[in-house]
Amino acid sequence: MASTVDIASSFIEGAPPGELADVVADVKTLTSNGADIIPSLAPAFERYNETQLATVKLPGASQEVLISEYNKLDGNRYFDVESQTSFEVDHVTQEASAAQSYVLDSQNADLIKSLLKSLGAHAREHYPNCAYGVYPIENDSAVAILLVSNRYSPNNFWNGRFRATYQFPVSEPTTVTGKIQVDVHYYEDGNVALNTNKPLNLSVSSLSAESIISRIATAERDYQEDLNRAFVQMAEGAFKGLRRQLPITRQKVEWEKVGGYRLGQDISGGKGR
């Protein structure tokens, strides 16, 4: 039988975009240990932040940086190539501290910096509230490209997150593999979640940053168009069948007598006849 920590951990790791704090509050309320259970959930918070590409602001900075398995150092420290900074993360509060200078030690440093420049231009053009990163992986024989964009609208009862993770070996020609994930949660008078996962396998003839990011941008645009078509099909198909159909009486409404109808009386506050 699953323990309380296991169950609470699954809640943490399944938190919708932008709603981790709400889930944490619910966990404290639902468990007999209350806030005392939170330290036991540290591994779950770490997995959530790395998987969801959580973002944090560096001390004294406004730009957000990524948390992921690809830029992880020892302990709870991570590094950001663009700002040349390493930092410590409190996975529960999603706050960064103890920032230090960090110099990228990679034989592919020039390629990584070029990719960051091209990726930054692409991200700023197409994704609001985004963060991105490029990191050496697999003993410096490959490169990982990460992009996340969050859109939170709790006043309208929805939150969403776009995540893209790519990697490719440093060879020419090369193949970029990865996936695009889109998660949206709508929770006004209900609970509807959209979770998509699109695997990608992209052939790139040149190892230049422009060629790689251009190929990625095309794949993301194509997937967005696929999603748009899927939404139209759902609206006209499955969702249409869920809507309550109003009866068809084929009778004209005599508007001058609308006050005599029950609906008209309800609206005007009159009494029924």
UniProtKB/Swiss-Prot annotation:
GO CC field: actin cortical patch; cellular bud tip; F-actin capping protein complex; incipient cellular bud site; mitotic actomyosin contractile ring
Primary localization: cytoplasm
Subcellular location: Cytoplasm; Cytoplasm, Cytoskeleton, Actin patch; Cytoplasm, Cytoskeleton
BP-aspect Gene Ontology terms: actin cortical patch organization; barbed-end actin filament capping; mating projection actin fusion focus assembly; mitotic actomyosin contractile ring assembly; mitotic actomyosin contractile ring contraction
InterPro entries: CapZ_alpha, CapZ_alpha/beta, CapZ_alpha/beta_2, CapZ_alpha_1, F-actin_cap_asu_CS
MF terms (GO), sorted A to Z: actin filament binding
Keywords: Actin capping, Actin-binding, Cytoplasm, Cytoskeleton
Keyword Cytoplasm attached: yes
Keyword field contains Ligase: no
Stated family: Belongs to the F-actin-capping protein alpha subunit family.
Subunit and interaction comment: Component of the F-actin capping complex, composed of a heterodimer of an alpha and a beta subunit.
Function of the molecule: F-actin-capping proteins bind in a Ca(2+)-independent manner to the fast growing ends of actin filaments (barbed end) thereby blocking the exchange of subunits at these ends. Unlike other capping proteins (such as gelsolin and severin), these proteins do not sever actin filaments.
Protein name in the entry: F-actin-capping protein subunit alpha
Organism of origin: Aspergillus oryzae (strain ATCC 42149 / RIB 40) (Yellow koji mold)
Protein's gene: cap1
